[in-house]
Each structure stands twice: as structure tokens, then as C-alpha cells.
Regions:
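Active-site environment of divalent metal-dependent phosphoester hydrolases
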Residues: 15-22, 41-46, 68-75, 110-115, ...
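A structural motif corresponding to the C-terminal end of an alpha-helix
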Residues: 91-105, 192-204, 240-250
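Short coil/turn segments at beta-strand junctions that form active-site/ligand-binding loops
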Residues: 6, 32, 59-60, 117, ...
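Binuclear metal-dependent phosphoesterase catalytic core
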Residues: 2-4, 115, 219-250, 256-294
Length: 294
């Protein structure tokens, strides 16, 4: 009998630089595909791929890079974002060659789409546009407030004293990664996602990104000592902005270290991070496949 459903297990924010693979709870083995939404292992792209393969246990794993997958290991480490992506792809190719089949796929802005049977997977890191900086700011209705908050947030985030470590730990060919680089890359990746979603596909579509497509997922941190501009760092409002007919069936993301599972129109949006203590190893999402003629 033909397969009628596909079962996807989402996972993200594994941080193998902090924990051993054996410390991760055993995954429900009923899944068909492991969807890895980034931050597998800081600065060690080969280990990131190898760990995903180990967790999947011979089943397909589909991966996007998280911000911390692209961190260098100190000022003497000159690897750039492009180099990290190349190393991730190379290790995936080695693993596939060893298995004599495609057991792991890395999706990125340069290669964002793959298909497994009837299911289309689209994946990018989805850096944020920094437009959500005013989310927690009172009187945020005025457009001027949005722009001013975003500009101030980018300035604070880009400063070595007050900003996230990624702006010291990630490198480009031009130098250190900056909030403006993130804004530019968000625009590029947003266009790539939209173009892919606009293409015809007969069957379910799953999007995998590291950063969140819904800004409200950052609200779990409100009042917990994080900067006022934190929503801008964690996500954008890309999913609500999409027309209903372009929305995927499932959107898997990470970056926020809290479980998240909501419905946005036809899309179920899920984060299932290992970091944060809320990981559910039995969270398997079942999508119906189109019935084929008998």
C-alpha cells in the first residue's frame, strides 16, 4: 500500500559544544524525516552534520545552519560564513557517499529546495530584518517609532559591549558580521523563500529556518532581563505577511530556546529546541500526502 503520510520530527538548538550527543533524549523512531533548524554545534560544521546523521539513524535529515553554527573559534579563526556553508555541504556529501544514498541534505540560500517523494522542503537561515525592535516599546503605532527603534537597536546590537556575540564571532569576506548584514541577507532570503513558495508543487511543503517567522515567539523572554530590542534579534513577521495560498503546511524553526507550536492560517509553526529544557523527543508531525490513483 502506498505511503499516505509523512512523519517529521523537528529539532533545533542542540549545542553539542555544551552537551554530548548521548545526553539528548532518545527520539521517537516513528519519524520519516528529521528537520534540523540550526545551531547544532558551534564552530564545528563537520560535527554538526555527523550529529544529525547519528540522531536520524539512517533516516533522512534536512538541515539549515543556525547563527551559532557559523561562529568562529576565536580571533585567529578566519573562516567566513561562505566557508562554513561549504564545509557543511562537503561533510554532507561525505556522509551521503559513505551511505551510498542521500541521508543528509543541507539547505541554504544558494541551494534552498529539495524534494523527498511528494514533499517539498525549503530552507534558509532567515536572518532577521530588525523590524521588530519596537515590539515591546509603548506607543509603537507611529511608523517613526518603528524606524527609530530599529536604528537604535541595530546600533546597540552592533556594539561589542552591548551586542550579541555573533557580531564578534561571525565573519564575512569584508570583515565582522553586522546587523546591517543581517538586514540585507534577510531581504535576499525572503525573496528566495517567496520565489520557492510561489513555484507549483503537488504535495505538502515544509519550510525550515533557524530564525523565527513569527515575532511573538520572542515574548517568552519579556521581563526576563533581555534587551528591549530582543524581538528584532529573534524573528520577523514573514509568515503572517504571506498570502494564505503561499503558506507552507509546516514551518520548523529554532533560535528561541522555548517550545513553540501555533497555527497561522494553514501553517503549523513549530520550534522544538534541545536547549532550554522543553525539548519533546516524541513530537512527530504527520502530514497527509496526496492520494495517487490506484
Amino acid at each position: 500500500m502506498p505511503q499516505r503520510t509523512i512523519r517529521i520530527l523537528p529539532i533545533s538548538d542542540i549545542y553539542l559544544e555544551r552537551r554530548k550527543l548521548k545526553e539528548i533524549p532518545t527520539l521517537d523512531q516513528s519519524f520519516d524525516v528529521l528537520a534540523c533548524a540550526g545551531d547544532l554545534c558551534e564552530g564545528q560544521p563537520e560535527m554538526a552534520i555527523q550529529s544529525a546523521v547519528a540522531l536520524a539513524r539512517g533516516k533522512p535529515a534536512i538541515i539549515v545552519a543556525g547563527n551559532q553554527d557559523l561562529y568562529t573559534n576565536g580571533p585567529e579563526d578566519r573562516r567566513t560564513i561562505s566557508e562554513f556553508h561549504r564545509l557543511l555541504r562537503n561533510e554532507a556529501e561525505r556522509q551521503n557517499a559513505r551511505a551510498h544514498r542521500d541521508i543528509v541534505t543541507v539547505l541554504s540560500a544558494d541551494d534552498p529546495v529539495c524534494e523527498l517523494g511528494q514533499v517539498r522542503f525549503i530552507g534558509v537561515t532567515l536572518w532577521t530584518d530588525w523590524a521588530q525592535a519596537s515590539r515591546w516599546v509603548p506607543n509603537q503605532e507611529a511608523p517613526k517609532c518603528h524606524e527609530m527603534c530599529a536604528a537604535e537597536a541595530r546600533s546597540l546590537a552592533g556594539h561589542w559591549r552591548s551586542g550579541p556575540r555573533e557580531y564578534r564571532a561571525i565573519r564575512t569576506e569584508r570583515g565582522p558580521w553586522t546587523p546591517l548584514d543581517a538586514v540585507a541577507e534577510h531581504g535576499r532570503e525572503r525573496a528566495i523563500l517567496l520565489d520557492a513558495l510561489a513555484g507549483y508543487h503537488h504535495g505538502p511543503t515544509v519550510v525550515i529556518t533557524h530564525h523565527a517567522p513569527l515575532a511573538n515567539c520572542a515574548d517568552v523572554y519579556r521581563g526576563r532581563g533581555v534587551p528591549w530590542w530582543a524581538p528584532a534579534f529573534y524573528g520577523s513577521e514573514l509568515l503572517p505577511a504571506l498570502p494564505e495560498e503561499m503558506r507552507p503546511d509546516l514551518w520548523v524553526f529554532g533560535h528561541v530556546h522555548a517550545a513553540f507550536d501555533v497555527q497561522c492560517g494553514r501553517t503549523r509553526a513549530i520550534a522544538n529546541p534541545v536547549e532550554g529544557g522543553q525539548f519533546n523527543p516524541r513530537l512527530v508531525v504527520e502530514l497527509e500526502l496526496d492520494r495517487q490513483p490506484d
